[in-house]
Amino acid sequence: PAKVATLKWQSLKDDSARLAAAIGGTVDVMEAVPASAQDQLKGAGWNVESKPGYGNPFLMFNTQKAPFDKPEVRRAILKAIDKQKLINSSLEGQAVEATSFLPEANPAYKKPSTDLSYDKDAASKLLSDAGVSGLEVNLVTTDHPWVLSLVPQIKSDLEALGLKVNHTQMASSDLYANVTDVDNPTYDIVLAPGDPS
């Protein structure tokens, strides 16, 4: 039997609004607590727990568009991003570098055969071998605050590889309906959370 008579869900995307609702007592449970807010919540008497999950941010490449149709180019971009630095700076160390959509604790997890860990020299070589230079990339992201916090370093890492990066953000519903889930997509790369809700 249920231990609570009713549950009321509030969808608060803005981290500041979520934090204010938690500290103000208008919510009893908060999912996806921003790393930067954990100490403040603990100070307000909240019990904050962290567990491995499935909310990995991911890059989605438009493989119908050159040069993203080349696996070497996609690997180069992924290897150019210093993921551990992202975890330490943007996520305050509250994550582990993912190698799959499944966390390693999942019984179905398999270690991938392709190493996509940070290696700027290998990334440069992959781009060179693919015959790509001076690439301009349009990076489209959702407007989730924690996803947006990843953009400056990703942009910097890709620019250090010699790419020019333009960034646009939009709501998940608009991004999927108007950018990715269309007959002839024109985007280059999308950065989104594992759960776009």
Can you name each region flagged by the protein language model?
Residues 39-50, 183-186:
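Ligand-binding "clamshell"
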Residues 3-6, 23-24, 54-98, 126, ...:
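Alpha-helical secondary-structure segments
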Residues 128-196:
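Ligand/substrate-recognition segments at binding pockets and active sites
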Residues 1-40, 164:
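Ligand-site clamp/hinge motif
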Residues 96-129, 146-149:
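Structural transition elements
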Residues 15, 31-37, 54, 83, ...:
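Beta->alpha turn/N-cap motifs
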